[in-house]
């Protein structure tokens, strides 16, 4: 992260997020996010972000805390490139699905959510879908599979006029995008 010259931490609503690193030097990945497996003991936190103490200079680092199903899914899609663990688009998509569903549920429960984040995660699924290798099949289980099914159900219920994929320059409309998701994950 230091070598790549990344900026760390971004603000969303009231909270700073120190698990996402962006704007690295040319030749480095566009973004780095830190993930951690849920520990086998109770944590006194409500949300899925856990602080990580490294040293006194890095007191605000955090990681996205994953349940066992998402951790196993992430590890099953992990590839090492130049000594760095990375995920392909096909394994990132279910994380974006989960993020959208989570925000949608919070909004429906009356909680304030950032509409830009809600829209971003919805479209990130389709943006990433464009770069998934044709014909690939991805296996999942548990909560990951539930999220995939739920995303497909929810996004299929949204009026297609509200999902302007072709106008955004994507090579498919919502219905074709949903078909591709089913071919990959179901």
Language model regions located:
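Compositionally biased terminal segments of proteins
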Residues: 1-186
